[in-house]
Regions:
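Feature marks short, highly hydrophobic, charge-poor N-terminal signal-anchor/signal peptide-like helices
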Residues: 1-8
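Hydrophobic alpha-helical membrane-insertion segments, chiefly the h-region
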Residues: 12-21
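Short, well-ordered, aromatic-rich surface patches in folded extracellular/luminal domains
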Residues: 23-73, 105-107, 119-121, 125-188
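Short, solvent-exposed loop/hinge segments that bridge or flank secondary-structure elements
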Residues: 68-84
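Short acidic-glycine loop/turn motifs at beta-strand connectors
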Residues: 83-88, 150-154
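Acidic/histidine-rich, surface-exposed loop or edge segments in extracytoplasmic proteins
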Residues: 85-104
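A structural signal for short hydrophobic/aromatic patches embedded in well-ordered alpha helices
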Residues: 113-119
Length: 188
């Protein structure tokens, strides 16, 4: 009789463990989770024409690490930020090179800074790429670029690609020079 109860106990325990194993969800692995996996989206509901011209926030990452020609701007990753706070335009930039050399600065810009910034956005029709997202899993953060612009009307331009540049080289150069992120030698 003792063996019967022991056998039933073991069978019951095995049944409970088996049910628990079937109910537990294992994490799903998708192809974009592995190194080299790609996520590519076009958000078609994002406007390709922005009505407002009043930028309140601007964030941009430009990578020239893999550029064939950096046009005197160095093979660097530039981070450019500008925002209107209490009527002032606060600007930040920093850049870094693969070897560790870097520079950063923060300053209050002239009143027409955002107007000049909007001119670059308009001249290169950056809104036409609005909603583009491309991400390759496993890449280091020194490649590609991103752009996030918020307007006073809450309109937004958002572009991201962690593999390739998102802006024309001329636009990249104009932005870097506008923010003052280039050194004196690079401006000449």
């Amino acid at each position: 009789m003792k063996w019967l109860f022991l056998g039933l106990g073991v069978a019951f325990t095995a049944l409970i463990c088996g049910i628990g194993a079937f109910r537990r969800k294992l994490p799903e692995k998708t192809s974009e989770d592995i190194d080299g996996g790609v996520v590519k989206r076009y958000q078609t509901d994002m406007p390709k024409v922005i009505e407002s011209t009043e930028i309140v926030s601007f964030q941009c990452v430009i990578s020239l690490i893999a550029a064939c020609e950096a046009e005197g701007l160095g093979h660097r990753v530039y981070k450019l930020d500008a925002a209107v706070r209490d009527g002032e335009v606060l600007v930040k930039y920093d850049w870094r090179e693969r070897g560790g050399k870097s520079d950063r600065a923060e300053y209050t810009a002239e009143a027409d800074f955002m107007v000049r910034l909007q001119k670059i956005v308009s001249d290169y029709d950056l809104a036409s790429q609005n909603g583009y997202y491309h991400n390759v899993s496993g890449l280091p953060d020194m490649y590609g670029g991103s752009l996030d612009i918020v307007y006073a009307t809450d309109e937004r331009i958002h572009i991201h690609d962690n593999q390739s540049g998102i802006l024309p080289p001329e636009a990249e150069r104009e932005l870097i020079l506008l923010f003052g992120a280039a050194t004196k030698l690079e401006r000449e």
